[in-house]
Amino acid sequence: MERVIVQFSIPGMTSKVYDQIWDELRKAGQSHPAGLHYHVGAQQGDNWLVVDVWESVEAFNKFGETLMPILVNAGVNPESSKPVITPVHYEYDAALVH
């Protein structure tokens, strides 16, 4: 399997909506999504930026089956918020350095 970076830039999203989405993901049993190695979310201008590292595109797509309906219910337009998926070339994890 090839690790991938998944990036979302979601127009108009706020931290409040982002937190609500995570609450819904937890209710759906996705507190720790299978295959997700790393996740960050932050306000970037008028957009909400999400950057993930996933074990594989297949793992992300499986999670997307739960995520996408939650995003739509939160008012996110899937057409303007499509993820950019890029294969990982190199990954450094400081937690693994002793």
Where are these regions (language model features)?
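Short S/T/G/P-rich N-terminal loop/turn motif that feeds into the first structured element of a domain
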Residues: 1-51, 55-69, 76-98
